[in-house]
Amino acid sequence: MPLKGINVLELAGLAPGPFCGMILAQFGASVIRVDKIYESYNAIDCLGHGKRSIALNLKVNEGSNIFRKLVNQSDVLIDPYRPGVMERMKLGPEELMGINKKLIYARLTGFGHNGPYANMAGHDINYLALSGLLSLFGRHNQKPTPPVNLVADFAGGGLMCAFGIVLALFERSKSGIGQVIDASMVDGSAYLGSWFFRSQNVPGLWGNPRGKNILDSGTHFYDTYETKDKQYMCVGAIESKFYEIFLEKLGISSHEMPQFENFEESREKLEKIFKQKTQAEWCAIFDGTDACVTPVLNLKDVASHAHNKERNIFKTEDNGLVTPNPAPRLSRTPGMSKKHERNAKLGEHTTEILTELDFKPEEIVNLIANGIINQGMKHSKL
C-alpha cells in the first residue's frame, strides 16, 4: 500500500481526527492512537479499526517522556486539540520537531491556530457557517439547513488534513524535513466551496435567493421526488439534451413542460407523476439512460444496489453494518478496509508498544502503579 512504512501518532479526539487517521491507516500507514489515561472515545469512535492504542498521562513528565520517544520514531502527529494545549505540556511543534526534524505535525482544529475565534469551542455547523457555505443549504423561504456534519468535520477537516499530510510527506522526500500543518475546518470547508465562490457571476447559475437557483432545488429538473412506496428519486437533468430524455421517459413533451419556465407548476406535476410508481419501477424506466435520474438510497440499501454491488463500493459486516471501502482506487497499491479489525480498547496495546520502545516488564509495572499508563485493564470514564 502507498503509505506502508509511515508511522502515525493520532491523539485521540472526536470524528475529524479519527477519520484522518483512518484514511492513512487504510492506505498502509501504521497508526497508534494516543488515548488519555482514563478517558476513552472508544464508545463513539467508529473509525479506529486497525489502529493500536496506548493510554498515556501526558500531563506528567514520565508520560510526556514516553510520548517523546514515540514521536522520535514517528513520521506524523495528528493533534486535534485547541491552540496552546500541546504547548502547555511542552509538546508543541518547536519542542517535538526539535526531537525529530522529519516530523509532520498536523494540527486539526475548527477555527485554526490564530484569529479571534481560534480558542472558541465549535462544531461542524459553526465552521460551515463561518465558511459561508451554510448559507447555500436550504429551501426557499426556509432557514439555512445543516447537511449533517459531513462538510466541515469530514471533508473540510479530516480529509483535507490527510491531504495536507500526504503533501507534506511528498515534500519531505525532497527536503528531508517535516513541517507544521494548520488544518482548519473553516479553511477547508471554504476551499471545498471554491467553485461556488468563483461561479457567482456565471449567467443563470446564481443570483436568486437560496432555494431559487438551478443547483439548490430552485428548479423542477434538479430536485427529489417521492415515489408510490414512500421512497425517493432524484432528478438532475440540467443540460437540455438530458432534459429531453427525461421528458421522453415520462411521456411528456417539452411544450407541456418547458425547461426554464414555470418551475413551481412543473414541480407540482412531477410530484404527482412520481407518486404513480414505486422506486423500483422508476429505476426500470430510467436505469441505463442519460436522463440523470437515480434512486435515493438509504444507508442500509446501498450495498445491494446493482451498480454499487458490481463495483464493490460497500461491504457488509457480520453484524449487518454496511461500510464503504477505501477510495480512490489505486491500480497497483489500493487501500484496504480495516473494518475486519475491531476498534482497539483504551490502552489495549500499551504494553506491546512500550516493549517495542525497549521498556522492561518491571518498568511497565511501575508506570501502571504510578498512574502514568493504562494497559486497558481498568474501566474508562466516558
Question: PLM features: residue spans?
Answer:
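A glycine-rich dinucleotide-binding beta-alpha-beta segment and adjacent secondary-structure elements
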Residues: 288-340
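Active-site-adjacent "lid/gating" segments in soluble enzymes
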Residues: 23, 27, 87-233, 237-238, ...
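Flexible, small-/acidic-enriched active-site or ligand-binding loops
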Residues: 318-368
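Conserved small-residue-rich beta-alpha loop and adjacent elements
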Residues: 2-39
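Aromatic-enriched alpha-helical interface/lid elements that frame and gate functional surfaces
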Residues: 220-293
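A structured beta-alpha segment of the ubiquitous adenosine-cofactor-binding alpha/beta core
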Residues: 9, 47-99, 275
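Glycine-rich phosphate-binding loop and adjoining beta1-alpha1-beta2 segment
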Residues: 26-58
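Eukaryotic N-terminal low-complexity, Ser/Thr- and Lys/Arg-rich leader segments
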Residues: 1, 378-382
